[in-house]
Amino acid sequence: MKSNKYDIQDTEIRVIGESSSSPKRKWGWIILAAALMIGVIASIIAFSRTSSQEEVGVFEKAAHQPIPHPLRGWIQSLDRITDICVVTKDTTVNDIPMRLYVPLNMTPHLEVGYTCIDDTTNNMLLWQAADVRADNQKIVGAFVLRGKPLSWGLSKKGYCGIIGDQVTIGVADNSPLFEQATEVGGYFFRQYPLVSNGMLVENELKSQSTRRGLCELEGKVVVVETFTPESLHDFSQALVDLGTTNAIYLVGSSAIGWHRNIDGVGIASGQWEPRVYKNVSFIVWSK
């Protein structure tokens, strides 16, 4: 007798049911695999972020994170003052004690020689501007006095141009303000650059001394002076953290400075004697 393929033999075991897994079991495996994949990806991302962060040891200082300096609001409040005066403010930035001199309602000009420091009637604020060369005692860098060029050169890339009542502080190899000053009877001088567009400018000068800077701060021209000897790098960084947009150096150390305070009292700084450099220059604010 011919056997049927559906007949069950004595030695056979046949399982009755579907040969493939149920749909629910398939979806369960898919969901589990997806969850595992997501977990692996999340772990990789977290590890990469952790690896990219700077590892700071217990004896190291974390990276410097500057915060807005509280004097920024104070500078803006001076707009209400209409008198011709010099307002000062003492503060500390990055552990550097310093003083801000803010001349109000005045435009500076340049002077050469010591005559201006004896005029304590009209002058309100003055500081030495350009450096004097040690070899021939001439002015260092380009210098224009009331439209007349007294010196040429690009030993320092920082500059200050005074055209009419507009004061411009900047950093550049060549500035059109030099030519413009010669054409319209303006002023121009060069110094070490400290801050350019809110960024610190490095200089080769590494010594420490009292530092002074001519700065642009919230639309105003201010002079900043340290009370302690500082490197040019630390001084520049403090000016950046203070919020200055642009800044150049003014002669520091024992150089001559003078201002009339809000009470009308004249206060001198630096060494006023002996007066030996005929080409000494000053930036002066007068009534």
Regions found by a protein language model. Give the residues of each.
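Active-site-adjacent helix-turn-beta-strand microarchitecture at beta-sheet edges
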Residues: W127-Q128, R133-M199
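Zymogen propeptides
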Residues: K2-W152
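Short, surface-exposed charged micro-motifs
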Residues: K89, Y159, G213
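Beta-strand-turn-beta hairpins that frame and shape the catalytic cleft
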Residues: V93-M98, I162-Q166, E216-V222
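Conserved, well-ordered active-site substructure
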Residues: Q137-L154, S207, E216, K220-T245, ...
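Flexible, glycine-rich surface segments
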Residues: G185-V224
